[in-house]
Structure formats: structure tokens, C-alpha cells
Amino acid sequence: MTKEKKKTGIEPKVFFPPLIIVGILCWLTVRDLDAANVVINAVFSYVTNVWGWAFEWYMVVMLFGWFWLVFGPYAKKRLGNEPPEFSTASWIFMMFASCTSAAVLFWGSIEIYYYISTPPFALEPNSTGAKELGLAYSLFHWGPLPWATYSFLSVAFAYFFFVRKMDVIRPSSTLVPLVGEKHAKGLFGTIVDNFYLVALIFAMGTSLGLATPLVTECMQWLFGIPHTLQLDAIIITCWIILNAICVACGLQKGVKIASDVRSYLSFLMLGWVFIVSGASFIMNYFTDSVGMLLMYLPRMLFYTDAVGKGGFPQGWTVFYWAWWVIYAIQMSIFLARISRGRTVRELCFGMVMGLTASTWILWTVLGSNTLLLMDKNIINIPNLIEQYGVARAIIETWAALPLSTATMWGFFILCFIATVTLINACSYTLAMSTCREVRDGEEPPLLVRIGWSILVGIIGIVLLALGGLKPIQTAIIAGGCPLFFVNIMVTLSFIKDAKQNWKD
């Protein structure tokens, strides 16, 4: 019994370092918020201006890697000997479900405003040209390019899972072919895993920092409860307690049902916005934006604005590429797990087409609605942001729709459920990654899951206390830097091992 407990307990070398590092950073931040904001601005400026080009080249190289997988020697290779575990329709639906987080609802509703008010290519703010390019840039940041990079890593993890039969819960497990077993299981592998976990903790904290204000603003609109930082903290605490109860009482089936409800409700809410906002305008704007994307794509891919120094690519493209990089391993492991039995070509095409369709639908519908409300002077987003914050501006884009009370209830429920499932997924992923071994069908220890959910909640509160989007953007970019190198190593390890062991 003691041996079994030891086997399934925490792995100290990957549990305590991230806990200590994140704890110290949170403590230093809370000690002096003003000094923390100065450091945040300096880190953001350094990484985006000095290393922004590296993120852009990474995405381009991975896109070529996607073409190599689709048309190269591994295209028809099957990821496992079994037939596909899920039907194609269910597989695509599960992909869509992974795209409907509250953080995505946050950016989908407000992103276009920033692109129009501070446009790229020295365009005039709020001009026709800026509006024509606004949605095109959203389609660029949330389109085939990042999903192609994810598909490459998903193939890599699926290969290690189903072809090489490796039990991969941390990235170091995949690096044996590249650096050897001694280094992968030694100090080097431990450092890699700690980089991954620290970055993942901050990424999840930022998602919570984006999602929570949406829920509290909904509560203010529906119930008249003033939105304060204290209310944000109370809501996060309630989510953590609810997650602990679900885990302790074995209510994971209920969480799964909630996740399904989130997906169906997302379809319903998007359909409602599409119909009442103006379906013909949305389709025309989308069509025009695809054309703009194709016309400007080469410029977008390599745009650093080194001469003009307007800051658009640093504030948005580099930020989003870091966002994609930081979530790459977690998302790719999930997408690989549900793709057993697929061929490499099926996985690559399915991900790019299915997931691009999901994000394009979200951004087109929500972004078009925001643009229409701005053009018709129904809402004044700059004033709302200045007086009440970004979350209030997002809420008003939903409240301006017909049947506003019913719409707001739907949005409130969607955001609430999305955040509950987010915290559940966060605690599960971090607990799995910091335990010695969890067999199939077993759950990671309860206290470990609760502990990680508390830490993620604390990070969300700290980021909310700092205020604005810059701390959230900086947390993503700073975390994306080490994961940038980890993702490259996982990719190279897959290529090396596949050449040796995945032959006809």
C-alpha cells in the first residue's frame, strides 16, 4: 500500500520548483503593483521587439512542416493499429468544443475594435481600410497557420502514444530520441518539464483572468451587483470550491455533461447573433475579409514594422503566436489522444479544416456584430473601456442584441460553464503532469488537483489586480519564450525517431 501511494504521489522535482517559482512571482507582484507594472512593460517590450521575428519564422517553418506531413512519406501512415476511436463527425465536434472557452469569447468580441482603432500598415484609425483589414487579421491570427503548427505537434504526440507506445504526460518523455535517455530523464529533462509547467500555469491563469470579468460583468448587468476585484476573487473562489466538490464526489461525469452543454450553447448563441445581427452583412464581410487575407498574407506573415515602429505586430501577432506556442503541448496532447487510428494526412487536414472553421465562425460572427454596433453608434466602445474596462464593453456588445435579457442569461451561463470546465481541465492537466504515475482509468490525487486550481486562481486574481490587458499579454509572451524551444525539441525528436522506426 505504501509503495502504491508512493508510486502515484507527486513527483517532487516537477511539483515543487514550479510551485515555488510561481509563488515567489505572485508574492513580488502583490508587494508592489506599480513596480510590477514597470517590469511587465519592460519584459513585454524586450521580448516582442528583440525576439518577435523568431516567433514569426517559427510559424512559417511549421507551416512548411505541415505540407511535408500531408504530402511526404508519412502521409498515409496510421497512428495506431486500431480503427478510429471516434466517428469523423464526433471527432470534428470535439475539436470545436475545445475552441469555445471563455477566453476565446473574450477576444472574439473585442479584438476587432483594437485592430480598427490602432490598425497595422500605417492605416488611418477607424478608416474604411482599417475596417476592411480588421476581420482579415483575426482570420490570420486564428486561422490555418496556427492550426497547422498544432497539427504537426499532434502528429508527433500521436506517434509517441500509439506507434511507439510511450506514456507521455510531460514533454521530456518525448525527448529520448533527441537527447538520449540519460538527459531526458535527468537534469535536462527536469528543466524542460519545469519550463513547460511554469508557462502552462501562467497561461491558465491568464485565461482565468480574461474569463472572470465577463462573468462578474454579467452579474452586474443581470442582478445589479457592482463589479469589483473582491467580487472577482469571490467568483474564482466559488469555482475552485465547486471544482473540488466535483472531484471529491466523483462528479466528473457531470463536468463532462457541462462541457457538452457548453458546446451546444455555443452553437445556439452564435446562431442567434448571426441571425439577429445581420446574416447578409456577416457573410459579405467574411467573404471580403478572406480576399483581404489572401492579398495581404505574405506581408502579415513577416510583418515586424521595424521602420515604422507602430507596435501592431508586437502587440498582436507576436502576442498571439506566443499564445499558440504556450498552449501547443497541452492542446496537441488532447488532439492526439482523440485521433487514434487516423492517418497522418487525416489528422493534419481534419485539424486545419475543422478547427479553422470553428475559430473563423466564432471570430466572424462576434467580430462582425461588434463592427455593426460601432458603425451604427449603438455602443461607444472607447468610452466603455475607459470608464468601465474591456469586459464591460464586451458585455454591451451582447446586451445590445434583441431579447437582451435572454441573450445575457445565455451568455452568462456559457461563460460560467466554460470557466468551470477550464478550472477542472487546468487542475487535471497540472496534477497529471506533476504526479509520478497515474494509470489508465485512475484520477490524479484530489489534494494535488485542488492545490493547482487554487494556484491558478491566485494568478488570475493577481493579473486582475494589475489591471488592463498588458499584464495578461506579457504573461503569455514571457511564458511562450521557453515553450518556443521546447516545442522545437519535441518536433525534432519526432522527426529523428520517425526516420529510424517508422519505415515501410
Curated annotation (Swiss-Prot):
Keywords: Antiport, Cell inner membrane, Cell membrane, Membrane, Transmembrane, Transmembrane helix, Transport
GO cellular component, one term: plasma membrane
Highest taxon in the source lineage: Bacteria
UniProt catalytic activity: 4-(trimethylamino)butanoate(in) + (R)-carnitine(out) = 4-(trimethylamino)butanoate(out) + (R)-carnitine(in)
Keyword Ligase: no
Pathway: Amine and polyamine metabolism; carnitine metabolism
HAMAP family: CaiT
Family of the protein in this entry: Belongs to the BCCT transporter (TC 2.A.15) family. CaiT subfamily.
Record text on subunit structure and interactions: Homotrimer.
Protein name: L-carnitine/gamma-butyrobetaine antiporter
Species assigned in the record: Escherichia fergusonii (strain ATCC 35469 / DSM 13698 / CCUG 18766 / IAM 14443 / JCM 21226 / LMG 7866 / NBRC 102419 / NCTC 12128 / CDC 0568-73)
